[in-house]
Structures are given as C-alpha cells and as structure tokens.
Amino acid sequence: MQKYLEKANVLIEALPYIRKFNSKIILIKYGGSAMENEELKHCVMQDIALLKLVGLKPIIVHGGGKDISAMCEKLGVKSEFKNGLRVSDKATTEVASMVLNHINKNLVHSLQNLGVKAIGLCGKDGALLECVKKDENLAFVGTIQKVNSKILEELLEKDFLPIIAPIGMDENFNTYNINADDAACAIAKALRAEKLAFLTDTAGLYEDFNDKNSLISKISLEQAKILAPKIEGGMHVKLKSCIDACENGVKKVHILDGRVKHSLLLEFFTDEGIGTLVG
C-alpha cells in the first residue's frame, strides 16, 4: 500500500506545477550524454512527451557535435575547433547539415511513437533562423540576427511540437552551422519562453567546479552576473547564455544533468528540483 501512496504523492506534488505552466512555452536544448545513451534518450523523450500531453508547449533545439565529428572522420573531412567552436568550411557544413537532419528525423519518429505531433525543422526552413558570419576564422559558423518566430507560434497553435536543427542561412542563402546553445537561447528570447532548459553533462552550476559540494541549486540574475567572471570554460559560456536569456524575456533558465533519468520532470514538477535554476 505504501508504494501506491508514494506514487499518488508524486502526482499530487506535480499538480500545482502542471497548472502553473499550462500553455507556457518551454525551450529545451537537447545534447550531450542524453543524446548518446539509448536509455537516457528514451527517458528524455518520455519526459518531453509528458510535458506536451499535460498542456505545456515544449520546443526542442538539438545538437549533434559528436555525431558530426564521427561522420567527418568517416568521410575524411578534417575537423578543426577554435575556442570550442567547430570551424565549418563548406564540406564540414554539408556534413553537419546531413547529420543534424538525420538526428532531427529520428527525434520526430521517437516522439510520434509516444503520441506527440512532432515536426522537424532546420533554421533554413521558412528562413526561421537568419544569420550572419560569426567570424571569418570560423568560416560558415553563423550568429543569429533574426528568429522568424511566427512560424513556431503557428505550429504551437496547431498543437505541433517543433524540433529544430541548428542550421541557418544568410540573405544570400549561404548555409551556416550554428552553436545549438546559441540557437536555443535566441529562440527562447524571441518567443519570450517561460523556461529555457539546457541538458548538460554536469550536475549544474558550481561555485567552484573542483568542489562538488558547491553546487548552486538556485541563483538570481544579479547573483549570476557577479559569479559569471569567476567561472571558466564551457560553463562560463553557458552562464552568459542564461544571463542573456533572463535579461531578454525568458523567465527562468535551468542547467540540468542530462545523465540523470527524467531530469526534466524532476526539475519542473517537484518541489526540490534538480540542477541549477537561474533567474
């Protein structure tokens, strides 16, 4: 009997959050181990399907860095990185487009199997993500200048769940590879999303990354600005994205451990949450 009561309590705990976030846009940046491990992948798809089916409006932006690197190696296309960003010449950009399209359609298939009306897009579709070149040294890596959010708003209105591959184009129809974190942040800002969640390979934001007891469960925007200069590496970039999002219309940003099963549900629908909440 006790285990049934515990299950009931879980549902009761989730109820106020389901009510609070009903019809709200939730932007999920999907990447890291949660994309590479089949069991974790299935858990993430279940979480997102449940978010959709209880009335939230999720949108997925996915990465694919390791798969792109593997395909480049297989095809003999040289991979080069500068400051953590892939240098994308025309050959690399073509490989990235191919790999991301394949990942995108697999995600659509997974969510369709869970009863969700999912639709796959890349940033070139309908000029969803309009770009300019980020840096001459990075070749076809783009910075988003405009998100044509009307496309996404209409899809959400028709009960679709958009899944977006981070490929964009410029005014001359050149194709650009876009950092998936940047794409997720730009789309969340354009839609003034209720939440932006980054699935990562870390438990969240640490005050001192070498001290695993320094995990920050919640941090205000002002505190995040003070902490940002003290953080190094990839998490510094991610925290800057969190600050940018919160300053431009996104209510809350979450840094979650994608290696934990059902981390999205644990963060959104429980009192304690998991990971770091910014904002």
UniProtKB/Swiss-Prot annotation:
Q: What is its EC number?
A: 2.7.2.8
Organism (species)? Campylobacter jejuni subsp. jejuni serotype O:23/36 (strain 81-176)
User: Which family would the database say this protein is a member of?
Assistant: Belongs to the acetylglutamate kinase family. ArgB subfamily.
Its UniProt pathway annotation is: Amino-acid biosynthesis; L-arginine biosynthesis; N(2)-acetyl-L-ornithine from L-glutamate: step 2/4
Q: Does the keyword Protein biosynthesis apply?
A: no
Keyword set for this entry?
Amino-acid biosynthesis, Arginine biosynthesis, ATP-binding, Cytoplasm, Kinase, Nucleotide-binding, Transferase
Marked site (Transition state stabilizer) residue numbers: 29, 238
Q: Which InterPro entries match?
A: AceGlu_kinase-like_sf, AcgluKinase_fam, ArgB, Asp/Glu/Uridylate_kinase, Glu/AcGlu_kinase, NAGK-C
Catalysed reaction(s) here are: N-acetyl-L-glutamate + ATP = N-acetyl-L-glutamyl 5-phosphate + ADP
**PANTHER family (alphabetical):** N-ACETYLGLUTAMATE SYNTHASE, N-ACETYLGLUTAMATE SYNTHASE, MITOCHONDRIAL
Q: Where does substrate bind?
A: 64-65, 86, 177
Q: Is the keyword Transmembrane helix in the record?
A: no
Please give a single GO biological process term from the UniProt record: L-arginine biosynthetic process
Q: What is this protein called?
A: Acetylglutamate kinase
Report the subcellular localization.
Cytoplasm
The Swiss-Prot or TrEMBL record annotates one GO molecular function as: ATP binding
Its biological purpose is as follows: Catalyzes the ATP-dependent phosphorylation of N-acetyl-L-glutamate.
The UniProt entry, under Pfam families, shows:
AA_kinase (PF00696)
Entry GO CC: cytoplasm
Q: Per UniProt, what is the name of the gene that codes for the protein in this document?
A: argB
HAMAP family assigned: ArgB
